[in-house]
Amino acid sequence: MTTISIGEPTVRMTQEERSEKSRQQILDAALKLFSHKGYGATSVRDIAEEAGLSKGNVYHHFPDKETIFRGLLDRYFQAMSQPDFPFNRALAEGSFPENLEGIGNAVREIVRDYREYVALIYVDVVEFDGTHVRKFYGDMAERFNSFMKAHGMEKELEGKLAAGLSPVSAVMLATRIFYNYFTVEILFGVKDHFGKDTDAAVREISRILRHGMLKPNA
């Protein structure tokens, strides 16, 4: 008598699901290789081997290596546009510039969790002269402006800033300073490069951004 074991039903992936899974495997493998070896030193064969797929499978999903590279940057930029992206959440939930520490900590989370994607930006600058990231940075002020208007931040911030200062410039400046700080700390591996621990540095940077570095007038 044959015994039939009845367990969990087998879940079969559709062709579309299998194809998408392979595509993501390729992108994940390329991210690891591009961010550590660079673009030029990584071949399509390297990506296929890292992904556990054939070279033909890679070409089935992507016509060439540069398309994979662009796909990774697009993946990162798409994540940055989501409401739950740490920076967007911190900016929307707080009141600028009172929430500068929160923004700094959000940027720390981003550079830590998206470290390999941040590295790709440097790869693009070195190996492509910034071709793939130029438009993203060129459109940055417009994106900040749209975000702040959508969340009703612009008018409120105008009332807090010194005369003639742009709310968009103020938020962008603070953001870029924190990105620079955490890129050096996390991506370059230079701990406490302001001569103090990270939390203390975030507090001091926030204080300088809010109040300036000079003593108030007597």
Q: Across the structure, where does each feature detected by a protein language model lie?
A:
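N-terminal intrinsically disordered/low-complexity leader segments
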Residues: 1-21, 88, 217-218
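Helix-turn-helix
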Residues: 14, 21, 25, 29-67, ...
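Short coil/turn segments at alpha/beta junctions that flank glycine-rich nucleotide-binding fingerprints
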Residues: 36-40, 114, 158-159
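Short, basic, alpha-helical segments at the C-terminal edge of helix-turn-helix-like DNA-binding modules
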Residues: 74-80
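Hydrophobic alpha-helical connector segments
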Residues: 85-116, 121, 167-174, 202, ...
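Short secondary-structure transition hinges
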Residues: 92, 98, 108-149, 194-195
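Hydrophobic/aromatic-rich alpha-helical bundle segments in the mid-to-C-terminal region
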Residues: 118, 134, 138, 153-207, ...
